[in-house]
Amino acid sequence: MNLFNLDRFRFEKRNKIEEAPEATPQPSQPGPSSPISLSAEEENAEGEVSRAGTPDSDVTEKTEDSSVPETPENDRKASISYFKNQRGIQYIDLSSDSEDVVSPNCSSTVQEKKFNKDTVIIVSEPSEDEESQGLPTMATRNNNDITNLKNLSFFPNYSDNLSTVRQTRYSENLSSDLLKLIDSTSTMDGAIAAALLMFGDAEGGGPRKRKLSSSSEPFEEDEFNDDQSMKKKRLDHGEESNESAESSTNWEKQESIVLKLQKEFPNFDKEELREVLKEHEWMYTEALESLKVFAEDQDMQYASPSEFPNGKEVSSRSQNYPKNAAKTKLKQKCSMKPQNGFNKKRKKNVFNPKRVIEDSEYDSGSDVGSSLDEDYSSGEEVMEDGYKGKILHFLQDASIGELTLIPQCSQKKAQKITELRPFNSWEALFTKMSKTNGLSEDLIWHCKTLIQERDVVIKLMNKCEDISNKLTKQVTMLTGNGGGWNTEQPSILNQSLSLKPYQKVGLNWLALVHKHGLNGILADEMGLGKTIQAIAFLAYLYQEGNKGPHLIVVPASTIDNWLREVNLWCPTLKVLCYYGSQEERKQIRYNIHSRYEEYNVIVTTYNCAISSSDDRSLFRRLKLNYAIFDEGHMLKNMGSIRYQHLMTINANNRLLLTGTPVQNNLLELMSLLNFVMPHMFSSSTSEIRRMFSSKTKPADEQSIYEKERIAHAKQIIKPFILRRVKEEVLKQLPPKKDRIELCAMSEKQEQLYMNLFNRLKKSINNMEKNTEMCNVMMQLRKMANHPLLHRQYYTAEKLKEMSQLMLKEPTHCEANPDLIFEDMEVMTDFELHVLCKQYRHINNFQLDMDLILDSGKFRVLGCILSELKQKGDRVVLFSQFTMMLDILEVLLKHHQHRYLRLDGKTQISERIHLIDEFNTDMDIFVFLLSTKAGGLGINLTSANVVILHDIDCNPYNDKQAEDRCHRVGQTKEVLVIKLIGQGTIEESMLKINQQKLKLEQDMTTVDEGDEGSMPADIATLLKTSMGL
C-alpha cells in the first residue's frame, strides 16, 4: 500500500467513524481492535459490494478474516461506477496527450473548485498499486496486527509521539513483532509501510510490485486477476438489473464494440478488451490503435511462426510466456497514462501536488506507455552497480551542454559540477554533490533517468538500422538478379505526360516502403514535383487493386492546383473535394455517409479536416487506405492541437510531402517521424523530445555529443525519408544565385529607429514573458522596414483635430469624437493616411509622397527594379506584412510598374486565376506576394528574380518562397535578392537563419569516409536498378 492509498484508507475510516460510531464489531475479532467493521456474515450477504469511495478498479478480493470498512447496508448503492467521483473526493488526472498540455479535467479541478477541509485530493497517477487493482489484501496471519496498527493512525497527533502507542488500549492486541517494529520507526507512516512490507509480502498478499524476473508472480497474479474478473462480472450483472431501457441499449452497443474489437484481436479475452475500451471511453479507433501498438511490441519480442520450420517450437515458447505478463503489459500499453520510470525521491513529500506535477515533467509521458518501464524496475531504492559506472563516467566527462540535459540541471548547476571534478569514486561523487551549495544527490538519480532515455533512443536507432538494412538488402538483391522490380510509369497516367527519371525513382521508393508495411516522408527539395510523384503512387495503388478511398490534406492555397494536377495526370481517379462553408461540408458528409458520391480520392485542406467536431468525426470514422499530407512541415510540433487532431485520422498508411523536413531543430523532424510511424515512435515520445530538443549551435560551438545527436537522427530517419536536392537530380536546371543587399536607413528612419530602440531597452528589464519580448522584436522589425508601420507623424493633437472634423462626415455625424480618437490612436501612420484619402473633410492631413517613400529599402528597391526592367527580367516580390504590401503598391504605382497582388485575404478561387494571368501576360512586371500565403505550392517559373523585402525568422519559409521560381520548368538563371536593414535587428536574424540552414546541411550531406564505399543509399540503389 503506497501512501496515496493509505491516505484514502484513513479518509474512509474517518468518515465511517462519524457516520456509524456504534457499528457492531466483527465477531471473529473480539475486542476493540476493529470498532467500525461490519461482521463477515453481513459483508458476505451484501453480494460482494465494493467499499465506499473506492472505484471499481480498486476493488480487491476479500478473505474471510479481513476487516474492511463499508457503508451501512441501508445506505448502500446498487453499483459504484468507475467514472463517478465519490462524495468528498476530488480526482485529479495528471495524464495528458502532451507534456506541454495539462489535462482539462485537472485544470478545471484545480482552478475552478475550492476544496473544503473535508475534501481529500487523490492525484490519479499510475503507480504500482494500480497493477494489483487497488488496496492489497493482507495476509491472514498478520491481519489483526496491521488492522490494529491502522486504527491507531486515527488518533490526533499520533505521529508526534509514537511511544504512546504502548499506553493505548490497543497495545494489548499487538504482537511482539509489531511492537518491535513500532520501536524501530519514528513515525506511524513508517510503521505502517514497514508492516506492509514485512507481513504483506510474506504471504504474497502485500502490495505487488511488478518484477520481470519473478518466477512465482505469474501464478499469484493470475489467480488474483481471475478472481477480479469474476467479481467484475458479478458487479456488471448487478448493475444491469437496475439500469433503465436506455442504459440497456448503451450496454448492447458497448458489447457490439467489444465483439468488433475481438474480431481484430481474437487472442484477447473480452474482459481485457472491455478494460481497454473503458480506458479510452469506448472510442473504438483509439482502443484499436493502442492494441495494435501492444501487438506490435509482442511480435518484436517473440518470433513469428514463419521463423520456425514447425509450429511446436513456437507453441512451446508461447506457453512459457505467462498469461498475466501479457495482461499486465496490455494494461500498461493501452492506458493513456504515463508510467513512472525511475525516481528515487518519489516517497519524499509524496502528498505535495506541486511536487507530483513537477516530477511528472520528467516521467516517461508518451501516449502508449513508456518504454523505460519495460526495461527497468521502478521505484527501487538501490542503485545498480552497472549504472554507477555509467553515471560516474558521464558526470566526469560530459560537457556543460550535455549536463544541462539532466532533468532539473541548469547551466549554473552544470558549471558547478565541472568545478567539482574529478570524481574518483561513487562515494566521492555522492559526498561532493551532497555538500555543495546549489547541488544535491537528486541530480545523480536524475542522471540515471537521462542515461535510460539515451538507451531508449539507441535501441530505437538499432531498430531503424535493421529496417534500413533489410530494405537495402532487398534492393541490392533485386538489382543483382535484374528485372522484376522496376515499377514503370502506371498505364492509367496521362500517356502524353511522362515522369522524369528521378520521379520514377521516387515512385519506386514509395512502392518499396509500401510493400514493407512502412510509412514514409517524401522530402524532395521544393520544385522537384512531389505532387506528381504522389499522384503517380496513387495510380500505382489503383493498378494494384487498391482503389481507395485515399485522403489528401493540403494548404488552402494549393487545393486548386492539386485538383488540377490530379485531373491532368490521372483522370481515372475520381476526386471528391471536401471544401466550402459549414453547410456545404455538411451536405458533402451526408453524401459520403449515404454513398451517393463515388470517389477514390478526397482532397481537403488542413482547416476543413479538423475545424469542427463533425469534420474530425468524419475522418475518424471513415476507413481510409492512404492519407497524404502536403507541406508536411506544418506537423512539426507534436504538442499542437492540429497535430493531435490529425493523428486521429483513420488511415492505414500515411505519407508526408515536405520540401523542408528540418527547419528549426531535430525535434521537429522527429515529430514528423512520430506522425507517420506512430506504432514505432509513440512509445518513445518523451525520450525523443528530451534527447533532440536542444537548440542548434554554430559548427564551431558544437560538442562531440551535438554531432553524435545529428548522426543519431540521420540513422533513425534513413529508412523512412527520401530527400533529393535539385543539384543532384536536375543538372539541366539553371543555377540560383543569392545576393544580400544591405540597405542603410534614411536619416529620419535611423533617428526613429534609435529612439524606439532606446525606449524599448529601458523597459526590457521589466519584461518577464516571452510574448512581450517577441513584441519588442516585432516593433524593431517594423521600424527597420518602414517608419509608416508605426505612428510617428500623426500626433495626438492632429488626431483630436481629425476626430472633430470627422463629425462633419454624413457617416459619422452622430458619432462620439472621443471614441473616434481612441480608434485613431491604435492605427499606424499609413492606415491614417489611407483614412484621410477616404474622407473629404480630413483630406488635408494626407502624408506627402516624400514621407511615404522615405525608407532605406525603398531607395535600394527603386534602383533594383529599374535595372531589372531594362534587362527584361520579371520579379516576384515577397513581404511578411500585408501592410508593407500596401505601401509597396504605392511605390510601384509611383514608378509606373504593372503588378498583381496575392495575400491571405485573396479568395482561394481567385488565386489560380491570378497565377495563370501572371504566367501568360508577360507585360506584368511584378507579382506581390505575402510569404505565408504565396510561399507554398505555387508555380511562378515565368519570373526569374525573387526579392525578399523582409526576411522571415524561419529561413525555410524564405526558401519556400524562392522556389516558386527555381523549380521544374525554369529556363533562366534565378536571382534571389534579400533586403537587410543595415544596423538593425535584421542582421542578427540573418545570422541565426544561417545557423538553422547549417543543420539541414549536416543532416543531408554524406559523412566523411563514406565516399568510395559501397552505395547504401536506397535512392542510389533504386536508380542503379532502373538503369538511370
UniProtKB/Swiss-Prot annotation:
Signal peptide: none annotated. CDD domains: DEXHc_SMARCAD1, SF2_C_SNF. Residues 158-200, 253-296 form the CUE domain. It catalyses: ATP + H2O = ADP + phosphate + H(+). It is an enzyme of class 3 (hydrolase). It is found in: Nucleus; Chromosome. The keyword Phosphoprotein applies. The keyword Phosphoprotein applies. Residues 511-679 form the Helicase ATP-binding domain. GO terms for biological process: chromosome separation; DNA double-strand break processing; positive regulation of transcription by RNA polymerase II. PROSITE patterns: CUE, HELICASE_ATP_BIND_1, HELICASE_CTER. There is a cross-link at residues 77, 84, 337, 473, 726, 998 (Glycyl lysine isopeptide (Lys-Gly) (interchain with G-Cter in SUMO2)). Keywords: Acetylation, ATP-binding, Chromatin regulator, Chromosome, DNA damage, DNA repair, DNA-binding, Helicase, Hydrolase, Isopeptide bond, Nucleotide-binding, Nucleus, Phosphoprotein, Repeat, Ubl conjugation. The modification Phosphoserine is found at residues 57, 79, 124, 127, 132, 153, 213, 216, 241, 244, 304. Residues 13-81, 204-253, 303-348 are annotated as: Disordered. Belongs to the SNF2/RAD54 helicase family. PANTHER family: SNF2/RAD54 HELICASE FAMILY. DNA helicase that possesses intrinsic ATP-dependent nucleosome-remodeling activity and is both required for DNA repair and heterochromatin organization. Promotes DNA end resection of double-strand breaks (DSBs) following DNA damage: probably acts by weakening histone DNA interactions in nucleosomes flanking DSBs. Required for the restoration of heterochromatin organization after replication. Acts at replication sites to facilitate the maintenance of heterochromatin by directing H3 and H4 histones deacetylation, H3 'Lys-9' trimethylation (H3K9me3) and restoration of silencing. This is SWI/SNF-related matrix-associated actin-dependent regulator of chromatin subfamily A containing DEAD/H box 1. It comes from Bos taurus (Bovine). The lineage of its organism: Eukaryota, Metazoa, Chordata, Craniata, Vertebrata. The gene is SMARCAD1.
